[in-house]
Amino acid sequence: MSAYLHCLSHTPLVGYVDPVAEVLAEVDEVVAAARARIAAFDPQLVFLFAPDHYNGFFYDVMPSFCIGMAATAIGDFHSLAGPLDVPRETAEACAAAVLEAGVDAAVSYRMQVDHGFAQPLELLLGGLAEKPVVPVFINGVAVPLPGFQRARLLGEAIGRFARSTGKRVLFLGSGGLSHQPPVPELAKVDARMADRLLGSGRDLPTDERQARQQRVISAAEGFVADQNSLHPLNPEWDNHFLDLLEQRRFAELDGLGNAELSALAGKSTHEVKTWVTAFAALSAFGPYQAHERYYRPIPEWIAGFGSLSAHSLS
């Protein structure tokens, strides 16, 4: 019984708005090294914690957390499309264990996911269906949002379940760090966009999806030229966050409110709760050692870009 973890920022802007070649090569090297370490660990079961960007989860029913019994990636921004290899019975047992632990997570037998799930599977495992994976959605953009404490408790519950399987388990966290790309807010949009956020956005026409993606690309180009055009990145907070994870002090984030986090680091920074959930899950295996920390603010990707591995010491 052993566990490994890797948390990684994701970005849909790769190949659309990229940093200079040296930075791109640096990130590629970090990802390749992480992929090699995961391959050497050879996980038998993967738990992937990731957010959504109004591609699979909408305000018709917006859970704080959702565990997938089956899942399909839509292939936005040239990410991979197709089904994930979800072990249904394991996912069902996990969902039951989480509820019994007092954490109210929804379930989905038809989960639709975007690049937030697909990108780490492609970059770190080589594809959507290379390993059995239980996908766990954590709401990171649609208010009202879950807080750090609930994310931590979810992770602890999933970690205890994962430990009970007796398998080599990989925990993946996807998202963050500090960033605030142009994401629509229900309280601030017109009726047509509100209808999209209420569920009609599940199956966007091709031209509308392309226009939506172009808005993000244009925002990134504008952010490179003027880093006050969006909420600025916050390397100081990002590195403090990484320190807390490395030092197993992530419970200290319980007292950080959602409004305060948005003000500090941007409204999409709530995606880092996937990292907290992953580290909390790993902690269920006992003490851990974090390693291979990487961080760089990358305005071209509108992100404080981070990568961090850890393994259980049991």
Swiss-Prot record:
The protein's annotated pathway: Aromatic compound metabolism; 3-phenylpropanoate degradation
Residues forming the catalytic site: H115, H179
Matching InterPro entries: DHPP/DHXA_dioxygenase, Xdiol_dOase_suB
GO annotation, biological process: 3-phenylpropionate catabolic process
Keyword Ribonucleoprotein: no
Keywords: Aromatic hydrocarbons catabolism, Dioxygenase, Iron, Oxidoreductase
Keyword Oxidoreductase (UniProt): yes
EC identifiers of the protein: 1.13.11.16
Cofactor(s) essential for the protein: Fe(2+)
SUPFAM superfamilies named in the record: LigB-like (SSF53213)
Enzymatic reactions: 3-(2,3-dihydroxyphenyl)propanoate + O2 = (2Z,4E)-2-hydroxy-6-oxonona-2,4-dienedioate + H(+); (2E)-3-(2,3-dihydroxyphenyl)prop-2-enoate + O2 = (2Z,4E,7E)-2-hydroxy-6-oxonona-2,4,7-trienedioate + H(+)
Any one Gene Ontology molecular-function term assigned to this protein's record: ferrous iron binding
Function as written in the Swiss-Prot or TrEMBL entry: Catalyzes the non-heme iron(II)-dependent oxidative cleavage of 2,3-dihydroxyphenylpropionic acid and 2,3-dihydroxicinnamic acid into 2-hydroxy-6-ketononadienedioate and 2-hydroxy-6-ketononatrienedioate, respectively.
NCBIfam families assigned: PRK13370.1-1, PRK13370.1-2, PRK13370.1-4
Recorded family membership: Belongs to the LigB/MhpB extradiol dioxygenase family.
Quaternary context: Homotetramer.
Protein name stated in the entry: 2,3-dihydroxyphenylpropionate/2,3-dihydroxicinnamic acid 1,2-dioxygenase 1
